[in-house]
């Protein structure tokens, strides 16, 4: 049974405008990335050939996950409580910790499905939570 559904869309240019462009060292000081990404995700952001697109997709995925939890970001759920990764085939995965994991348990959720898509100007994500 579906216990949560969330979707989000992000304009990639808005995210790219908040990323320093002076090289790899500048990426290390990106405040938005530090606020949104976990340490593991941040390392991949810095190594990415398209850091703006990477961050936009992760931002959309985390917002979609928070909406599926019924809280949005806030109310005990932070960006740091939601981690986006990829399986060996490249499919996106979402993992919950701390407040996000507690909220998932309150909903009776046990599985999360994540889809991320991007085009030239936008990144979008959808999360479905199942019991």
UniProtKB/Swiss-Prot annotation:
Which keywords does this chain's UniProt record carry? Cytoplasm, Fatty acid biosynthesis, Fatty acid metabolism, Lipid biosynthesis, Lipid metabolism, Magnesium, Metal-binding, Transferase
Binding residues for Mg(2+): 8, 63
EC number of this enzyme: 2.7.8.7
Where is it predominantly found?
Answer: cytoplasm
SUPFAM superfamilies in the record, alphabetically? 4'-phosphopantetheinyl transferase
Intrachain disulfide bonds: none
Please verify whether the record's keywords include Coiled coil.
no
* Lineage, uppermost ranks: Bacteria, Pseudomonadati, Pseudomonadota, Gammaproteobacteria, Alteromonadales
**InterPro entries from the UniProt entry:** 4-PPantetheinyl_Trfase_dom, 4-PPantetheinyl_Trfase_dom_sf, ACPS, Ppantetheine-prot_Trfase_dom
Any one GO MF term held by the record is: holo-[acyl-carrier-protein] synthase activity
The reaction(s) catalysed by this protein are: apo-[ACP] + CoA = holo-[ACP] + adenosine 3',5'-bisphosphate + H(+)
Protein family: Belongs to the P-Pant transferase superfamily. AcpS family.
Compartment(s)? Cytoplasm
Which cofactor is essential here?
Mg(2+)
Described by its record, this protein's role is as follows:
Transfers the 4'-phosphopantetheine moiety from coenzyme A to a Ser of acyl-carrier-protein.
One of the GO biological process terms = fatty acid biosynthetic process
Gene Ontology terms, cellular component aspect?
Answer: cytoplasm
Gene label: acpS
Record carries keyword Transcription regulation: no
Name it: Holo-[acyl-carrier-protein] synthase
Q: What domain of life does the UniProt record list for this protein's source?
A: Bacteria
